[in-house]
């Protein structure tokens, strides 16, 4: 309902014929740059998973999985579609759930860690041209960075605490607990048999995931994953910069009239709207509203902001959904090499275990 109201209001600010004309007359060289930089971002994101997984899955399958992840990530609210990555690497490529969850959590938090300093740099670059509230945005970016660094540091202990809590909740164990949360859980009666079994499996998965997070730190992945995450973010926003230029060329805009730091801030606001629970199917309505709000504050006329929001969203969705659907169909095809992939995974895991023991 909220999305429908937003769509109605935003579409009332423009003529549909203008939107069609913008899409038809899109600047093809800039559109090609969008595709190329998006491809570079795909490789970088896949490489990050490859590093986090210690090479358990080859780059090409990870690129396919990432395309599927891109298909679902904006389709559902609060980016829960990104969990499709966990399903794909476990169900289709035989990766253990704990390794999949550890790589998923670490990639997510490193994404947030990477965007915070980039936001601060963009705010510094625009300087006095930013409207009132720039200091608040800088403070939020710094807070985001600090929070994410704390989350990285406490991820392993937090997962173990959650595992302990669920284990106690499942068994109703009355032994002394290590925290008020587990102590409160221990005073309760055991959960029903079915629920207890489910909670027990979840507790074991979380404990194993914590072990995998610790193993990642021991492998020294923090710096390379952070650097790759910076590249991922720069590719994403660089691609959108080219896409925005492509749709605004028919309206008289040039590279010199589109400041990259300004575009970065505007796109960042629209992207953050996808994490909200009110995010609609494919984000239509909420995305354009956040885009329009951000870019009008940064100096674009309302009509141009609305037009560019719809045009960039439509083109990017066609690009992501088209490639993601093809990748999904390819992955879901019956493949005779699935058992081999699982054997390769088990072999790689045992080799990694032996190497850590050397």
Please place each PLM-identified region on the residue numbering:
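Alpha-helical transmembrane segments of multi-pass membrane proteins
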Residues: 37-42, 69-74, 232, 267-275, ...
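Membrane-water interface at loop-to-transmembrane-helix junctions
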Residues: 184-230
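Membrane-interfacial helix-loop connectors
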Residues: 57, 244-311
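Alpha-helical transmembrane segments of integral membrane proteins
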Residues: 1, 29-33, 60-65, 136-140, ...
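Hydrophobic faces of transmembrane alpha-helices in multi-pass small-molecule transporters and flippases
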Residues: 31-35, 67-75, 101, 105, ...
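Short helix-coil transition sites and intra-membrane helix breaks within transmembrane domains
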Residues: 38-47, 52-54, 73-83, 274-287
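Transmembrane helix-loop-helix hairpins in multi-pass inner-membrane proteins
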Residues: 1-21, 69-194, 284-358
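Helix-loop-helix hairpins and the membrane-proximal interhelical loops
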Residues: 6-57, 217-261
